[in-house]
């Protein structure tokens, strides 16, 4: 899994590429939590995500709970 981060003022965008599974979910969680201070909009670009496991979904739920307190979270380019 590769993560490209872009931060503009209070918006943090993570473009994720590859698989989010039990091996890579902790990396995603660490990357998310490292830059959330002062962020009011978290954007996750799933255009290049091939797979997400329940461990990855847990990380997303945790991020959503945090963002509910300080702003909003948006998922983009999610496949069906």
Model-derived features: positions:
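Amphipathic alpha-helical interaction surfaces in cytosolic regulatory modules
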Residues: 22-80
